[in-house]
Swiss-Prot record:
Disulfide bridge partners, by residue number: none
Name recorded for this polypeptide: Putative F-box protein At4g09790
Source taxonomy: Eukaryota, Viridiplantae, Streptophyta, Embryophyta, Tracheophyta
Every F-box domain range: 1-51
Organism whose genome encodes this protein: Arabidopsis thaliana (Mouse-ear cress)
PROSITE patterns recorded: FBOX
């Protein structure tokens, strides 16, 4: 008698590719053959290719797990946030991996303003998961990272945009017209920063890591509504090169506004196959979170994600706090369980 485990391998693979990742554990216990198929690298690639892309969106204290399906016709694109969690605002951290010691580490930025010297003092700390302890990193960079610049983890390291550090003595006011951004990489193996000497003129620069590729994508704007997205074709801690522009769009005819995306917002992701970028920002009144779907040949769509605390525009108190812009990060589902350990001890200090 033929059973389901006797079906042709290709047919089984097509069937299993439609199973949600969170249910794959049950698949592996069905029979040895299914377990073997589910662990095959080619199956894993196909499975992730069919799955809806998932992202974590944080807006103030609300954290949402969002699934995204892009069809490219403007009518069937879907953004959904089925899981809502309440959390707290987070400090600036970066997670990486030491390839020599085979150990995960956490980089922490301590940025405090000192009135006596009238500029920020930046310290860096490393948390080693094996030793379960914090220690101060000996680094005196001649650059600084704006608080709204978000790092992106890739190949065990983390990349940031930084700018030249300007130290102002006394009460002088310095106006700098041609600030440039530098791409820097923190190498968790050597525990040092590597600087990419290719400068990028500043205005809006945000990064994204395509979920299925070992690349970085950069959203770039100047003081116009021309938006460009660049993608790397080679990236290592000490070497970065860029491919041609992935997408270049004049946003003014699409939005009817000359105002570009906010320089401290602009979380985004791209779909390289459909040539679509999805940028997360506020609406023009800076009240509701909004997703902007942008593509070639005038493709444009806005999706209202609602007010940051669950209420909509008509319920907003105009005297309330300043708007908090949504932050979206790539998310890859995994069956790996995170081990629970005791909290690491770190020296207390006043900030």
């Amino acid at each position: 008698m033929t059973t389901i485990c006797d079906l042709p391998r290709d047919l089984v693979a097509r069937i299993l590719s439609r199973v949600p990742l969170t249910s794959m554990r049950r698949v592996r216990f069905t029979c040895k053959r299914w377990n073997t198929i589910s662990k095959d690298p080619s199956f894993a690639k196909t499975h992730f290719g069919k799955a809806a892309r998932q992202f974590i969106m944080m807006s103030q204290s609300r954290v949402s797990l969002m699934s995204v399906k892009l069809h490219g016709d403007g009518n069937e694109d879907e953004l959904a946030d089925p899981y809502i969690y309440e959390g707290y605002r987070l400090d600036v951290y970066a997670l990486g991996y030491d390839k020599n010691l085979k150990n995960h580490k956490i980089l922490r930025f301590v940025d405090s303003y000192e009135p006596a010297v009238k500029h920020s003092i930046i310290e860096h700390e490393i948390f080693d998961l094996k030793s379960n302890a914090w220690r101060v990193l000996d680094a005196t960079p001649d650059w600084e990272i704006d608080s709204y610049q978000r790092g992106v983890s890739l190949k065990g390291n983390t990349y940031f945009f930084a700018k030249e550090k300007i130290v102002v003595e006394g009460d002088d006011v310095v106006v700098i017209e041609d600030f440039k951004d530098f791409l820097i990489c923190f190498d968790f193996t050597s525990e040092r920063f590597n600087l990419d000497h290719v400068c990028l003129y500043r205005f809006t620069l945000t990064m994204e890591r395509p979920v299925r590729e070992e690349q970085l994508a950069v959203l770039y704007q100047q003081d116009t509504c021309l938006m460009e997205i660049w993608v790397t074709n080679k990236i290592e801690p000490d070497v970065v090169s860029w491919s041609k522009v992935f997408l270049a769009v004049d946003m003014e005819p699409l939005t009817g506004s000359f105002i570009p995306f906010a320089f401290f917002a602009g979380s985004f992701f791209i779909d390289e196959e459909k040539k679509i970028a999805v940028v997360f920002d506020k609406d023009q009144e800076e009240i509701n979170d909004r997703a902007y779907l942008i593509g070639e040949n005038g493709y444009y769509k806005e999706v209202d994600l609602g007010y940051m605390n669950g209420y909509y525009q008509q319920q907003v108190d105009p005297r309330g706090p300043d708007p908090v812009f949504p932050l979206v990060c790539s998310y890859s589902p995994s069956l790996v369980t995170i081990p629970q350990g005791t909290r690491g001890k770190r020296k207390e200090r006043d900030y």
